[in-house]
């Protein structure tokens, strides 16, 4: 099994780990009583990356924009199941950005563009320049981005996800993960999917037909497949074609967002890894 080992560009799914850090260390405060758990958690993640990749030279953290995106226009219920950012987390955003700037780590937020789309577009942009990319995220949407040169570091499971691992676990190619999510939906992002189609059925259909388009081109064949409740599944697909195609558009990460980032912009300063927690200690005691 081959995975990226030497000097990759690290792209961190900042918003995902910002929330995870906030809830993991929600009671942590500095000496002035200001909340700092999210900051601590993010810096801890970065520090662990420095320890894992001792010769790390290129890193960038991508954050979501607060503005609505094209997906909200396509589907007004998109991510509507999520609550607004807690005030105690909002208070930590600006200090975190200031600390990351002092450390020398580039951050990027593009107004009106989701972090997933920025990560996808930047990854493919850098891949075209001959770079190897390691995306730090445990968001399953990211699996569609995996190529020979783009891997996912799943921090929760402490493993690197390659095309081979996706094929072994799901039996589908990374790019087919979009169709998979479109069929079964994604409760996390409120992507509807097709009613009554779960993981096993979605994987069966993708294995058989590869994508949504081929499924609907062969819709009359589905009722005869060796699949439990095949006739009902065929009916569900017919009755929910627009919903399936909408879900595909919602699940598909954009790869063509223009991003004005040069490789030199994300190269670390030599002092960076030694500086990480010293700067945090200064904030903690302020």
Curated annotation (Swiss-Prot):
GO molecular function: 5'-3' exonuclease activity; 5'-flap endonuclease activity; DNA binding
Protein name, as recorded: 5'-3' exonuclease
Residue ranges of every copy of the 5'-3' exonuclease domain listed in the record: 172-270
E.C. code: 3.1.11.-
Primary enzyme class: hydrolase
A Pfam family per the record: 5_3_exonuc_N
GO biological process terms on file: DNA replication, Okazaki fragment processing
Originating organism: Buchnera aphidicola subsp. Acyrthosiphon pisum (strain APS) (Acyrthosiphon pisum symbiotic bacterium)
Top-level taxon: Bacteria
Alphabetical list of Gene3D superfamilies matching this protein: 5' to 3' exonuclease, C-terminal subdomain, 5'-nuclease
CDD domains: H3TH_53EXO, PIN_53EXO
NCBIfam families membership: PRK14976.1-2
Role according to the record: 5'-3' exonuclease acting preferentially on double-stranded DNA.
Signal sequence region: none
SMART domains according to UniProt: 53EXOc, HhH2
Keyword entries, A-Z: DNA-binding, Exonuclease, Hydrolase, Nuclease
InterPro entries, per database record: 5-3_exonucl_a-hlix_arch_N, 5-3_exonuclease, 5-3_exonuclease_C_sf, DNA_polI_H3TH, FEN, HhH2, PIN-like_dom_sf
């Amino acid at each position: 099994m081959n995975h990226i080992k030497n000097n990759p560009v690290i792209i961190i799914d900042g918003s995902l780990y910002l929330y995870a850090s906030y809830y993991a260390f929600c009671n942590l405060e500095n000496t002035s009583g200001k909340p700092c758990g999210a900051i601590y958690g993010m810096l801890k993640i970065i520090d662990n990356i420095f320890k894992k990749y001792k010769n790390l030279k290129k890193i960038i953290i991508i954050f979501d924009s607060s503005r609505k995106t094209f997906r909200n226009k396509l589907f007004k219920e998109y991510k509507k199941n999520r609550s607004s950012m807690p005030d105690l987390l909002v208070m930590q955003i600006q200090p975190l950005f200031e600390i990351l700037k002092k450390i020398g780590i580039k951050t990027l937020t593009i107004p009106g563009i989701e972090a997933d789309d920025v990560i996808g577009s930047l990854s493919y942009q850098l891949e075209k320049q001959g770079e190897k990319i390691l995306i730090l995220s445990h968001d399953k949407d990211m699996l569609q981005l995996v190529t020979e040169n783009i891997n996912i570091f799943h921090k929760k499971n402490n493993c690197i996800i390659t095309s081979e691992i996706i094929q072994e676990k799901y039996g589908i190619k990374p790019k087919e993960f979009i169709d998979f999510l479109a069929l079964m939906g994604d409760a996390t992002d409120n992507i509807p999917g097709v009613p009554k189609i779960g993981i096993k059925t979605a994987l069966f259909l993708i294995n058989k037909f590869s994508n949504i388009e081929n499924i609907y081109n062969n819709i009359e064949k589905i009722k005869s497949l060796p699949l439990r409740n095949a006739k009902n599944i065929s009916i569900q697909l017919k009755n929910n074609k627009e919903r399936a195609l909408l879900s595909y558009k919602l699940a598909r990460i954009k790869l063509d967002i223009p991003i004005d980032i040069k490789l030199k912009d994300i190269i670390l300063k030599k002092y960076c890894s030694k500086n990480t927690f010293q700067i945090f200690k200064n904030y903690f005691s302020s």
